[in-house]
Amino acid sequence: MRNFRITFLIVGCLFVFGIYALARIPKQEFPEYTIRQGVVVGVYPGATAEEVEEQLAKPLEQFLMTYKEVKRSKTTSTSQNGMCYVMVELEDHVNDKDEVWSKIKHGLAAFKSQLPPGVAAVVTNDDFGDTSALLITLESDTRSYRELKGYMDDLSDRLRRIESVSNLRPYGVQQEQISIYADHERLAAYGIGEKVLSAALASQGLTPMGGSVSNAETETPIHIAPSLAGEREVAEQIIWSDPQGNVLRVKDVARVVREYDDPDSYIRNNGHRCVMLSMEMKAGFNIVQYGRDVDEVLHEFIAAELPADVQVQRIADQAKVVGDSVHSFLRDLFVAMAIIILVMMLLFPLRSAIVAAITIPLSTFISVGIMYLCGIPLNTVTLAALVVVLGMIVDNSIVVIDGYLDYLGRGHSRWFAAVESAREFFPSLLLATVCICMIFYPILFTMTGMMGDFLTYFPWTITINLMVSLLLAVLVIPFLEILIIPAVQPKKSGKSVTDRVHDLYRRVLAWTFRHGWLTISMGIASVIVSLLIAMQLKLRMVPFADRDQFAVEIYLRPDAPLERTAAVADSVYRVLHDDARVKSVTSFVGCSSPRFQMSYAPQIAGKNYAQFIINTTSVDDTEDILDQYADAWADRFPEAYVKFKQLDYQNVPSLEFRFYGSDIDSLRAAADGLMAQMRRMPELQWVHSDYEDPRSVIDVRLDPVTASQLGVTRTLAAVNLALASGDVPVGSVWEGDYRLPVVLKNDTRQGERSLSGIGDTYISSPVPSVSVPLRQIADVEPVWSQSKIVHRNGMRCITVTADLKRGANAMRMTSRISDIIDRELVLPAGVTTELGGAHEFDWETIPPIASGLSISLVIIFFFILVNFRKFGITLVVMASMSLCLFGAVVGLRIADFTIGLTSVLGFITLLGMIVRNVILMYQHAEDKRKVCHWSARLAAYDAGKRRMVPIFLTTATTAVGVVPMMFGGSTFWAPVGVTIFAGGIGSLILVVTILPVLYSKIYK
């Protein structure tokens, strides 16, 4: 007080620094959390799914599960013909995933020698969880893919100069190649096979070391120029000659053309040919500034380099999403400030309201400055914490101002009133503030994994804000009181809103003391009713995302060709493209998109899969489009399922039921029985399992006698069949920095290969000039083989899943299907079941939350016990926390919100509010009872009357502070606003009526 100029200087500097920090602080959509997933891919050409399972997948699983960091229960493997995928998930406590994956990669490099010799590769992808900050397409119908790739390479070179840009990756590029279409009849006539042809071309594609010539002064390297410069040179390449000088060239036995091969996959943007560039951002940078830097480079590139017939389009733009999100939350923040100040003006004397209102921007901007210094970014979570705590930061000031006015009313000087009000209430305010802050921290220790990462900064943001507001209340507010509030404030004619509320409260309080046990019974009844209502609420720990964007996934049967997938995708595209609410449609046919949202995992795609990224005109239009098309188009095509997928913060299926066992037939029988029941439920669609139907393979069994006589081994036969039936790379031609693969292909003009024609394939023998049809040395017949064999935690597991129709309740459907499994489904011997999907995710999340809350309550218990030193009061305070339930659950029920992670944060905030109010009320009662020697009944009655106004004002400001959050339309944060608003109002009524009565009963 005596050095107020220094205090004001420090506060002013911190305030200005906070404004500067708001512009400079790193901004994100969500906190950076670790996606502890990766995929290990094993390639085993020629092996059936059963062979892949036994010889590759099982050894890989056993090896990977020797690492203690691997979460075995979530690690799955999929074995299919020639390949296996092992989806590896790390334990939640792993923070440095790069270190773990480095160990796994080194281990796999050594372990590969223990796998069968036929295993071609074991590849680890540990950046599976990396999310693209920006997806850009370069599209043109008049330019070739080579030209588009050239423009993309130029753009990439420019973007790499931006410090924050990382991981520039191209997608959708079609490779130009030199195709050699072999004529099998001519090859057979000359007595040579594809092996000779491929060997001759492969030797010309090498870049050999020519040595060097050196003398006493110089050393000159020898360079052998490549003989293949294009398709003409390839066609003229000699592949055979005899002593008489007769030669056989490639063009004599094959047709050589430069072309773009029929693609296995491709990307289109709004129906136009395009290539895509995926960009990520380095950690610790401001993504909004990142977007501005990229914009500047793009504008320069388009103006200087790009022709008019090449367009640049943004598909997914995290910088824009974050910018809009931050702008929306800052708008809500300032609107909430204005609402709180307006409410204070209505409920508080004008000058007192001005003093309290000053602390709102001071506390907020100083807190942002401290967050910037501490490295806490501005994202959806920290902004939500700022809004949630906004109404609470003025509470300390209101209590101090109310005490100041009380001292003035008793005739004390302004100086004495200002100093004594701050000194008297500081211990209670400190205890209440610490209790509120401490409530949030245990959840950081009990929640691990992605959710733990997600909430890391929430408690710190609240703590910084509340502690700053406490310091302002006891260090700055006293001087502002002297400066602004006169000794005797003029009384307005008539009664204020606060006076009317106080008069009503006195009558209610008198009634509650006359009917004490009835009042307590009503409080208990409210808790029971709230629990009954809570049991009827939906449970979903994380909601759907509010985006002007959604995805469409198209699934066909596993053996569907790309042409059929493209036809279905084109039909869906035309409908969406003609919809005025759709801004753009990006098609991924035969492939999946990069991860453009953190919780949207890319699919392992094939020719039977297509995906769209659809950008719409607004979030509401996204909902309307999904409502219109999702159910109507799901089964529009008889051979395809079209899934309209709303972007979700939950990365697990809604419904998932697992069957474990060792026998595939038993697993299929159990799964088929459940699927038959589920297909009768109108709420479900696309009921399926992850085990696809068996598919046919051609089984070639060499005759051991005939094949051995000709020197044909299994390996030699496999090489010949691969050369005859597939596209085989045999070399490369370089045109500057542009690589042209040379590929040996079958000439489809001679007719498509049929299953019956496989036996006519000529097999080259080690015996010179001898080639024989395959049917002469082997039996060729089609057989059935498993398409996929899935393991989970090292065991065979078949998973049944289904999509919910719009509006269906996942929790109710899970319960209904679980009853069918328990009561109606007869499981074969050795088969066990397990619930997965959203049910598993929710029940993995709830125990850590409950543990965190339990620890918080224990901490609060000891804080209150140390302060009051009486078990009775402590137990009453703990029991009073349940009074927040009634208003909160009624509010959630009326708003039709689910109980989830964010609504739980709202409940935790309510607990802190109630603890603060109870401490303020009971501390006053204890002072009157001990110091003034009043009876417990009189002390409780006076505490109710005296503390009702500050409790009413603090609760009102906290409740109205979240009104913008309630009506902001966010499915993520609106439940927090509803919980705090409705729960705060409900708990206010119950606390000020029931708590005084309970105090009087403690000492009776």
Residue ranges and their predicted role:
Residues 83-85, 112, 158-338, 401, ...:
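Extracytoplasmic/periplasmic membrane-proximal domains and adjacent transmembrane bundles
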Residues 9, 48-55, 93-103, 132-135, ...:
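Solvent-exposed, non-transmembrane alpha-helical starts
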Residues 390-404, 425-446, 453-493, 612, ...:
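Transmembrane alpha-helices and their membrane-interface boundaries in multi-pass membrane transporters
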Residues 13-47, 95, 109-116, 443-454, ...:
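Transmembrane helices with small-residue packing motifs
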Residues 18-24, 338, 342-346, 350-405, ...:
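Hydrophobic transmembrane alpha-helices and their membrane-interface caps
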Residues 1-27, 423-425, 437, 479, ...:
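Signature of alpha-helical transmembrane segments and their immediate interfacial
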Residues 315, 322, 326, 401, ...:
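Helix-loop junctions and hydrophobic alpha-helical segments within the transmembrane domains
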Residues 15, 51-127, 185-206, 227, ...:
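Solvent-exposed, membrane-proximal periplasmic/extracellular interface segments of envelope transport
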